[in-house]
Amino acid sequence: MTKPPISHHFEIEFEVPGSADEVWQAIATPGGISSWMMPTDLEPREGGEVTFHMGPGAASHGHVTAYEPSHRITYEEDWATLVGQPGADVTPLVSEFLIEARSGGSCVVRIVTSAFGTGADWENEFWSEMTLGWAPMLDNLRLYMTHFRGQHATSLFASATCAGSPEAAAASMREALGIEGTTGETCTARDLVCAVERSMDRHFLLRAERPLTGLLSFFSYDAGESTTVQVVGYLFGDNPASYVAEEQQAWCDWLAAATAGTTADAAAT
């Protein structure tokens, strides 16, 4: 590096239900990771390749640097290329997951993410967004281990763009669902009966109860001249793949309508 390295570091520890083996299946296998974080390709071994599919045309590539079943997995990613800064003077993004079994049938999971850079604005923006993004992901993992442990999800992804602030867009989506965002509140998200599990200014999380089960994460974020709204689903139950094939575009249309005439573009994958 041409400048003294600046350390970027994030660490969090949380408890989830399940044995060490069950938690390992959730955080260190492709089917498990894809069921609460994002669609993932993973070769389950040290040196194996890993790819996180983050939406249309967006993927993060890396490789596994440690693989200790039921205890520890570590992988590195090229975060500079991911955000359009190829060749930047930074080290790989290293993420480590550690599992510690507790009495009573639960485990503590410790996540440590780190890298070195130069302190450039784009680095700080990336880390700020990434650390904020862990809270909803960990809620997903907690709920997955509580309600869907051992199952593999079918992914749903829909998006639209609109005018107005991300906070206003999220409020419009909540209004379209008829919810205030109180935990435990029930609603119908199109044809899925759901309960509210988490609500924040730009994000809320629903747990689908019928006719399919699963998780639906609703997001809104600043995309420059517009706001992007998204729903990311992890669906279980009776033939969720058929549901996604038939309903994914309809979810895009719902997002467009929910954000009230402000949509410039809507697309499904």
Region locations from a protein language model:
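Short acidic N-proximal helix/loop "leader" segments that mark the beginning
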Residues: 1-9
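Ordered, small/hydrophobic-rich secondary-structure cores
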Residues: 9, 13, 19-118
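Short beta-edge strand/loop motif at the mouth of beta-sheet-based domains
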Residues: 18, 30-63, 68, 72, ...
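Short amphipathic alpha-helical segments
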Residues: 19, 25, 126-133, 137, ...
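A structural signal for alpha-helix termini and helix-coil/disorder junctions
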Residues: 29, 39, 140-147, 151, ...
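Conserved short hydrophobic interaction patches
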Residues: 30, 67, 133, 137-144, ...
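Beta-strand/loop substructures that line and gate deep hydrophobic ligand-binding cavities in soluble
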Residues: 82-129, 200-269
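Surface-exposed beta-loop interaction hotspot
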Residues: 115-173
